[in-house]
Amino acid sequence: LIFVLCCFCGIAQAQPQRPKLVVGIVIDQMRWDYLYRYYARYGEGGFKRMLGEGFSVENCKIPYIPSVTAIGHSSIWTGSVPSIHGIAGNNFMKDGKVVNCTADETVNPVGSDSKAGKMSPRNLWVTTIGDELRLATNNRSKVVGVALKDRASILPAGHHANGAYWFDDKSGKFITSTFYMEKLPEWVNKFNKQKLPNKYLSKKWETLYPIDSYKESTSDDNNYENGIVEGEKAVLPLDLPALYKKYGYKILRNTPFGCNLTFDIAKAAIEGENLGRNTDTDLLTISCSSTDYIGHQVGVNAI
């Protein structure tokens, strides 16, 4: 009996090891079948590793319409649906008028003078995973959200995040609002000073592999696609310096380099906020928005 009791005491005292950092990644407009359609293209350390060592939900239901960015991100990070979390679309009726899901006239931009900074999660009625994590640890856990889209950064990060940062087309910088802070952290200023958008827009967009090897997709030059932006053909290679000169920083959103930039600031956030180096679990939410921007232009079967 003594032996048995000691065993149970040992089990009771053993605490499961908690992760130092949880990273949640949403790839906007990525269909489930892409995991298998492009499987041969994936490296061993990315999607193949997730499929081999992780868990794939292959019989799930989306119980709402439409499945747009704001609703999807809110539902993922709150575990609820529009009738509960309050985000009924990217834009929806509120008090008799159409509003942007994250627009907030009571806050001001931080890091820019653009109206793109007048955003917050006030329209989100419930808490996110990050909010609950902060509450559970008496604010010791850190929660940070990053994305090109404001709503894809703000809604996952939630009400009580340490920061949410999104891309400003006017300045080419990542910004936030006074809902979160009065001035940008030094690590964000340092990141913005690198002017990475200029670097990405200084070269052509070319395919990673020979263009005739993309057997999984429709031919590049076809009649089923809109342009990279309205009036510009989406045929690779694309002259990004010329497009940048004509359309400014917003053209970056419609290229794969928008995802590169998103992961660049995600890595900067890990270093700048010391995420994963605390005694409590931290959370970093990342959304790849460029796949959605270009997906609306060229469809689901493009190279």
Q: What feature does the model see in each segment?
A:
Residues 26, 31, 43-47, 72-73, ...:
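Stable alpha-helical elements in mature extracytoplasmic
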Residues 17, 21, 29, 33, ...:
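Soluble non-cytosolic domains of exported or imported proteins
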Residues 81, 89-280, 289-296:
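His/Asp/Glu-rich, glycine-adjacent segments
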Residues 1-17:
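Bacterial Sec-dependent N-terminal signal peptides
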Residues 35-84, 142-146:
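Short, structured active-site-proximal loop/turn typified by the sulfatase FGly-forming signature C/S-X-P-X-R
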